[in-house]
């Protein structure tokens, strides 16, 4: 197996859904199914924060979500937990700046997908040099889902990455909705990652379809 190509990674980032059990008011398995039917291109399991599952329950829940992703042929990424990603034989892992270092993550993950959250050009260059397949850049807009976020960058912050010669695939993160998706793509992102825009939508299916349309219209 070899590392994923830039072109393939770029396509996968189009509509990137992130979810844990505590991000939904409905059955999360049903929400994921609807999102997959609607056209998400990649999924990240992020079980964090108040009311999050732990231990065996967390592992069982991850396996259920992974099985659904497999049915649809959509990559299943684990947030921040390299050991869990390896245990599940997940398609990849996404790490932040305060998590395990990228060099050790790449070593453990082999050729699987590795994404890194970055907030500065320096962080981006370090991640690229040490084996990141894509960058998560943000928060682009204010968000209430993550309590530990850095300062809002706006689409200008994202455009700055491209202006500074960062050519690796980028997914915009933070406060992204159907209404502002186009501006994120126009600023240079390959895709958008969302939590509540899908997980709390009245219809996860309809919301996903609209996000897919917005992204393909803006690319």
UniProtKB/Swiss-Prot annotation:
GO terms for cellular component: cytoplasm. Its EC number is 2.5.1.3. 2-[(2R,5Z)-2-carboxy-4-methylthiazol-5(2H)-ylidene]ethyl phosphate binds at residues 143-145, 175, 195-196. Pathway: Cofactor biosynthesis; thiamine diphosphate biosynthesis; thiamine phosphate from 4-amino-2-methyl-5-diphosphomethylpyrimidine and 4-methyl-5-(2-phosphoethyl)-thiazole: step 1/1. GO terms for biological process: thiamine biosynthetic process; thiamine diphosphate biosynthetic process. The keyword Metal-binding applies. Mg(2+) binds at residues 80, 99. Binds 1 Mg(2+) ion per subunit. Its cofactor is Mg(2+). InterPro entries: Aldolase_TIM, ThiamineP_synth_sf, ThiamineP_synth_TenI, TMP_synthase. The keyword Transferase applies. It catalyses: 2-[(2R,5Z)-2-carboxy-4-methylthiazol-5(2H)-ylidene]ethyl phosphate + 4-amino-2-methyl-5-(diphosphooxymethyl)pyrimidine + 2 H(+) = thiamine phosphate + CO2 + diphosphate; 2-(2-carboxy-4-methylthiazol-5-yl)ethyl phosphate + 4-amino-2-methyl-5-(diphosphooxymethyl)pyrimidine + 2 H(+) = thiamine phosphate + CO2 + diphosphate; 4-methyl-5-(2-phosphooxyethyl)-thiazole + 4-amino-2-methyl-5-(diphosphooxymethyl)pyrimidine + H(+) = thiamine phosphate + diphosphate. 4-amino-2-methyl-5-(diphosphooxymethyl)pyrimidine binds at residues 44-48, 79, 117, 146. One of its GO terms (molecular function) is magnesium ion binding. Gene3D superfamilies: Aldolase class I. Keywords: Magnesium, Metal-binding, Thiamine biosynthesis, Transferase. It holds the Pfam family TMP-TENI. It comes from the Bacteria. PANTHER family: THIAMINE-PHOSPHATE PYROPHOSPHORYLASE, THIAMINE-PHOSPHATE SYNTHASE. Condenses 4-methyl-5-(beta-hydroxyethyl)thiazole monophosphate (THZ-P) and 2-methyl-4-amino-5-hydroxymethyl pyrimidine pyrophosphate (HMP-PP) to form thiamine monophosphate (TMP). Belongs to the thiamine-phosphate synthase family. This is Thiamine-phosphate synthase. It comes from Bacillus cereus (strain AH820). The gene is thiE.
């Amino acid at each position: 197996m070899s590392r994923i190509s830039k072109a393939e990674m770029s396509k996968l980032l189009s509509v990137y859904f992130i979810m844990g059990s505590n991000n939904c008011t409905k059955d999360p398995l049903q929400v994921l199914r609807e999102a997959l039917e609607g056209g998400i291109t990649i999924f990240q399991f992020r079980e964090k924060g108040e009311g999050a599952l732990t231990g065996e329950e967390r592992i069982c829940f991850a396996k259920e979500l992974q099985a659904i992703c497999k049915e649809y042929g959509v990559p299943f990424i684990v947030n921040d937990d390299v050991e869990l990603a390896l245990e599940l034989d997940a398609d990849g892992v996404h790490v932040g700046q305060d998590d395990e270092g990228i060099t050790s993550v790449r070593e453990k993950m082999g050729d699987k997908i590795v994404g890194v959250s970055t907030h500065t050009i320096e962080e981006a260059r370090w991640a690229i040099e040490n084996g990141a397949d894509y960058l998560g850049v943000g928060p682009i807009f204010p968000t209430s889902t993550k309590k530990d976020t850095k300062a809002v960058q706006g689409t200008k912050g994202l455009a700055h990455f491209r202006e500074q010669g960062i050519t690796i695939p980028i997914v915009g993160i933070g406060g992204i909705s159907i209404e502002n998706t186009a501006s994120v793509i126009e600023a240079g992102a390959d895709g958008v990652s969302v939590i509540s825009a899908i997980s709390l939508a009245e219809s996860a299916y309809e919301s996903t379809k609209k996000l897919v349309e917005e992204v393909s219209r803006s690319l």
